[in-house]
Amino acid sequence: MADEATRRVVSEIPVLKTNAGPRDRELWVQRLKEEYQSLIRYVENNKNSDNDWFRLESNKEGTRWFGKCWYIHDFLKYEFDIEFEIPITYPTTAPEIAVPELDGKTAKMYRGGKICLTDHFKPLWARNVPKFGLAHLMALGLGPWLAVEVPDLIQKGVIQHKEKCSQ
């Protein structure tokens, strides 16, 4: 997987038990409860370790998720909208997170602003179905992607802090 710190963070995220997706009706409701419990625990753990970096909410059915994530670089906060839909084959298929604001600004992204997770994250997800959920997607997918891509985009001048842009 990754370094020891990442392993520790992931070990503190509750694993999920219900193997269900949106078309499984009653089982999907149970899976959503587990997803929310896992996300809440992950966010609480992040806040307790002064590493709060995203907010997520969903539509009523739990099939469309949206929110914000942020990355601190040189004491400046870079904030981005995020969105994803739960695939009909979830949890076998991991959701594809989109950061629309960064669409076309990095090679590690597909059309529509969907971040590239194929090489590192998707094989890990596949080995851990149905135990991994949305909290794991954030911790092992979006978090590391932001940590690599945002500083690189800043260094190349592709993105600038909003305060610097308004001056």
UniProtKB/Swiss-Prot annotation:
Keywords: Isopeptide bond, Ubl conjugation, Ubl conjugation pathway. There is a cross-link at residue 122 (Glycyl lysine isopeptide (Lys-Gly) (interchain with G-Cter in UFM1)). E2-like enzyme which specifically catalyzes the second step in ufmylation. Accepts the ubiquitin-like modifier UFM1 from the E1 enzyme UBA5 and forms an intermediate with UFM1 via a thioester linkage. Ufmylation is involved in various processes, such as ribosome recycling, response to DNA damage, interferon response or reticulophagy (also called ER-phagy). Belongs to the ubiquitin-conjugating enzyme family. UFC1 subfamily. It comes from the Eukaryota. Ufmylated at Lys-122. Deufmylated by UFSP1. This is Ubiquitin-fold modifier-conjugating enzyme 1. It holds the Pfam family UFC1. In absence of UBA5, the active site is solvated by water molecules thereby reducing its nucleophilic activity. A linker region of UBA5 is required to reduce the amount of water molecules in the vicinity of the active site and elevate its nucleophilic activity. One of its GO terms (biological process) is protein K69-linked ufmylation. The keyword Ubl conjugation applies. One of its GO terms (molecular function) is UFM1 conjugating enzyme activity. The active site is at 116 (glycyl thioester intermediate).
